[in-house]
Amino acid sequence: MTSNEQHFKRDAWLSGRHRVWGRDVPAMDLDFILAEYDRCLPMALIDYKHEHGVINFQSANIRTLTALGDLAGLPAFIVRYGHSNQSGWWGEVEENSVPWFQIIPLNSHAHTAGVPSNDDNAKVTELVFVTWLYELRGRKIPQDIVNMLNK
């Protein structure tokens, strides 16, 4: 389970303070990167991006994420997510909205991780995406999760 963000002010302070320490100690907030794990072992690194978020493959964030994956021997991905029905660019998601996910492999480990589509532009359903998350862990999605996602 993911935890709710509880430390925005602390993190904003540290981010600003780090800039004061000089150009020769660069650091960055890696946005919304999750370590997908199973039994305390990392399975993949995923940077989740909203459908309106910018993806720049030459950015320091993406290049660093790719390098982290390579160094750890883990697949690294960008997963863009969106909804079929949303109120404005960053607005509330409508209750009848259908979520979609786009899985973009970043390194060689990711290209061999059983991505549900060979087309980086393909949008997959939430069920397909969550099934893939279970498969990354060598597991089968439980039927109760399938039933909940099919409602």
Predicted regions and their residues:
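Active-site metal-binding core of divalent-cation-utilizing nuclease and nuclease-like domains
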Residues: 1-39
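Active-site-adjacent loop/helix micro-motif of nuclease/hydrolase catalytic cores
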Residues: 25, 52-62
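Short connector loops at helix/strand junctions that flank enzyme active sites
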Residues: 27-29, 41-43, 60, 71-73
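Conserved catalytic cores of phosphodiester-cleaving nucleases, focusing on short active-site segments
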Residues: 32-34, 40-52
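Residue-level recognition of conserved beta-strand positions in structured domain cores
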Residues: 47-50, 59, 80
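Nucleic-acid nuclease catalytic cores
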Residues: 69-103
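Helix-rich interaction surfaces within compact, conserved domain-sized segments
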Residues: 94-151
